[in-house]
């Protein structure tokens, strides 16, 4: 409150434009959106997100107040158009020419800076939105979800790493469930043209004797159905990517592997606790581990390994995943 017990502001609507629209980036932007609603409970707040995430955004934000969810594709791109439509204020969740991909800044903090010109006040404000309910359970059997897709080699869950984990999970009586897609809705510039990012995985390299034990749900779920699947799972096991961030909007156990970054800059906080029902896994004995988190300049694209071998993914050790699952009660 300010003078005379009144809020400071002009009463115009606020437009949060999530043009940095990859699933993980959008989810990491939601704590800032929620903080904006809490700071100003009266103004209209519009959230412009990718159309393929519209239903998910409505569902995740509903417990936190009133928001108008709009499709980013319909957002007026010029200032003249926005003024003509009297849209109000606008903030984007991305800085221009963002090839540094948030090196030493947590993605939630980055979104706070872009959308609110502020930083979060502690871990509770940094926490993912977890209040939205889950839909019905898909399987009666206990199961563990493996997000298998990656947008780059240095985030690829390699078959050599995955296979022993799947084998152990199956031996403990859990059904391994594979999720993912082949083509991302996210686009990146290639040769001056925005094109969809291709998703890669190594499922075909898993031994046939293991593949037959898995339920393959790749390409078979909507985002909300995927969230339900993650939330009801006994655990979600994977490498840094959008599906793990989606799991972070539920109460699921998570094993979160990373190579180019470190937990300090990529942790998932729930209810103010970055260690809640989660274990972080990194490569063993690799000097360049956390390369992105060590880099202090902009303009290097860490989707691509500087050494061109993405060694960090091959040096993830299955035992570290399995020990994490044991610690989480599996």
Describe the role of every protein-language-model region.
Residues 1-330:
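Catalytic machinery of carbohydrate-active enzymes
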